[in-house]
Amino acid sequence: ASLGVTGHVVVTGGEPLIWLGRGLEDLACRLRELGAVEVETSGVYPPSAGLDRCVDYYDVSPKLSNAGVKAPLHPFYPSSPKAWFKFVVRDEADVEEAAAYVEARGIPRGRVFLMPMAETPEEHSAVLRRIWDAALRHGLRVTPRLHIEAWGNARGK
């Protein structure tokens, strides 16, 4: 704030919550002085009370079977009004799996977004067409990946 910088800071990386008790809380609280703090997480680890005080939003990305890993969702997140959920999907079967996941864990549908798994603009458009109707049927939002539309999978954009 002393530099005149304000806004929204996203703490991301493999899994930021592995740094609980090792500086993450202090970092988040210091960043909070600059504006809103969002933490991206798989949802496996719950935040500490100290971290939760300094975080405005959790961007929770539970893993579906298309990710090739099984990671349990901690019960903190479905009940937190700060948590928003993003599922990476490639087809109707993934949408069905995400909808079942949301239902089974009591995640509010209004806090759920589906994001196309794609690396090129052409693939992105194709995935959007494949998932759209299933998303509507389940009352789930779809968020496009505009950087893929603009630049494909180019780094640094």
State what each model feature region is.
Residues G13-G14:
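Active-site beta-strand/loop signature of hydrolases that rely on acidic residues for catalysis
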Residues A1-V10:
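Conserved alpha-helical substructure of the radical SAM core
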Residues V5, L17-K157:
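Conserved AdoMet/S-adenosylmethionine-binding subsite of the radical SAM
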